[in-house]
Regions:
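Short beta-strand-initiation
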Residues: 1, 223-226
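N- or domain-start disorder-to-order transition segments that initiate the globular core
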Residues: 1-22
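Charge-rich, well-structured scaffold segments of protease-associated domains
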Residues: 7, 18, 62-221, 228-229, ...
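M16/MPP (pitrilysin/insulinase) zinc-metallopeptidase core fold and M16-derived inactive scaffolds
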Residues: 26-90, 261
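Hydrophobic side chains within alpha-helical segments
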Residues: 50-53, 123, 130, 268
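Short glycine/threonine-rich loop/turn motifs
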Residues: 249
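Single conserved hydrophobic/aromatic residue that forms the stacking wall/gate
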Residues: 259-269
Length: 269
């Protein structure tokens, strides 16, 4: 294992692992700007921004963003969680500089055009409606809400229709301005990557960012609870959660092994 780390002068962090024998690489930037970093009024805005990621920048149209990666046989995507928003790509070794340039462009130069905002607003509202009609989605949102009541970790990632309907372009820009700083970002790359090359690319692309302080985030405390809903369905949907060690706890890997042995789908925080 050849894990290497570096931090730029503005706080931007880089973690790489060269994996011999591979001809491709996975690379991405993880931003500490997920659901838990939202205010109640902002609930859903991190996910909204993720939807806007590939809708155009000052240098590339939406089509150019897609074609730049697809034309070299690569894959690019993004996701939002309660902890982070991530932007990542998988490409061949020679296309790593291109992939990182596109990701940096998305992060640093989004145009957030009003027409695209309205299109994505409609898409997200449909997504919210579908989630509310899907018991598998509903029970896990309820689980979070009961585990962390009156806390950002207990809110949904998608947000509520009322809030999403009200987000403006300036709201999106304000969230970026507040949370998308170099110290809030980690560049992670694995596969056919050279650490020194990645550091040099990151310095050129992200080294000019101005540092900004972390926003205050309330500590999450597991509370627990119970919620039931009786509906006329043929199946019952059930979720049960327990407090577990955190990511930084020495017992986290033991806990993950236990979850795996119990046929759990994944190790969750």
């Amino acid at each position: 294992m050849s894990l290497q780390e570096h931090r730029l002068s503005n706080g931007f962090r880089i973690v790489t692992e060269n994996m011999p024998g591979l001809a491709s690489a996975s690379i991405g930037v993880w931003v500490a700007a997920g659901g838990r970093h939202e205010t109640p009024q902002q609930n859903g805005i991190a996910h909204f921004l993720e939807h806007m990621a590939f809708k155009g920048t000052k240098r590339r149209t939406a089509l150019q963003i897609a074609e730049s990666i697809e034309d070299v046989g690569g894959y690019i995507n993004a996701y939002t969680s309660r902890e982070v928003t991530a932007y990542y790509a998988r490409v061949l070794q020679n296309d790593v500089p291109l992939a990182l340039d596109v990701i940096a462009d998305i992060l640093l130069n989004p145009t957030l055009e009003e027409t695209e905002i309205e299109v994505e607003r409609g898409v997200i509202l449909q997504e919210i409606g579908q989630a509310l009609d899907t018991p598998d989605d509903v029970i896990f949102d309820w689980l979070q809400e009961e585990a962390y009541p009156d806390h950002p970790m207990g809110r949904t990632i998608l947000g509520a229709s009322e809030g999403v309907s009200a987000f403006s372009r300036s709201d999106l820009q304000g969230f970026i301005q507040q949370h998308y700083g170099p110290e809030q970002m980690i560049l992670s790359a694995a596969g056919a990557v050279d650490h020194d090359e990645i550091v040099k690319l990151a310095e050129n692309l992200f080294g000019g960012m101005d540092a900004k302080p972390f926003a205050d985030v309330a500590a999450a405390r597991f509370m627990g609870g119970e919620r039931r809903q009786i509906k006329a369905l043929e199946q019952a949907h059930f979720a049960l959660a327990f407090e577990s060690p955190g990511y930084r706890d020495a017992q986290i890997y033991t806990a993950c092994l236990l979850y795996t042995s119990d046929a759990a789908d994944e190790c969750v925080n």
